[in-house]
Amino acid sequence: NRNAKLRILDGERLMAEADSAGEVCVIDVPSAERWDIDSPKLYTCEVALETGDVQRVKFGFRDIEFRADGFYLNGRRVFMRGLNRHQSYPYMGYAAPESLQREDARILKEELCCNAVRTSHYPQSQYFIDECDRLGLLVFTELPGWQHIGDERWKEQACENLREMILQYRNHPSIVLWGVRINESVDDDAFYARTNAIAHELDPSRPTSGVRYIQKSSLLEDVYSYNDFSHTGDNPGCKPKHAVMSSRKKALLISEHTGHMYPTKSYDTWSH
């Protein structure tokens, strides 16, 4: 282990500092402001090793909790209103530059009046998440995949993808939920017990969820995320909680609803 000096900065102003000879260091910042969707206060954590290496990371202080009746940020109930986001662009695919990544976050927050975004169905650019931190957008990010669950070797890789995602993104205050299921996959209790445990071990401060389109499927996570495509235009809207979940003691998050605005595959029909 190397000795390290940690400093918490508000801009250039020193808020707190401490020395550490191990991997864990606890610092009290009694005058810190909380990060919120309306006032997304960010601080800088600077770690300097005695060898001269220095690393600076932006972060924020906030309390998050999902209860049976919804999401709470810093003790205040917040109705999450957001969209799913893919980071592909015409002519450049997933190689979008920083400016476009940040612009998408701005559009979501300022033009579409969202307070949340789901990075479907994979971790996305650090530039995008950085801007969510700065603007005050709540983020639900999940391990990559869609509908398919493979063999044991495939599952090991999925677990490793989850570990890497959490270690890379866990300092972002905007991220409030880890997605530990493969999007719209069938129940696999043994596999998803593993992914849920990995997330809680690496980051006990955040709840877990997993997106499914199955009603009353196994709930191993902290939040039940459900893609509700029941709306046809004639019915009132999404299904009630008791029709979707076998237990109403945990929160229900509608992760998608209604359906695509236009066909996305050759076998889709306009009537769907």
Please tell me what each predicted stretch does:
Residues 1-139, 161, 176-177, 198-201:
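Secreted/periplasmic carbohydrate-active enzymes, especially glycoside hydrolases
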Residues 106, 110, 116-272:
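Substrate-binding/catalytic cleft of secreted carbohydrate-active enzymes
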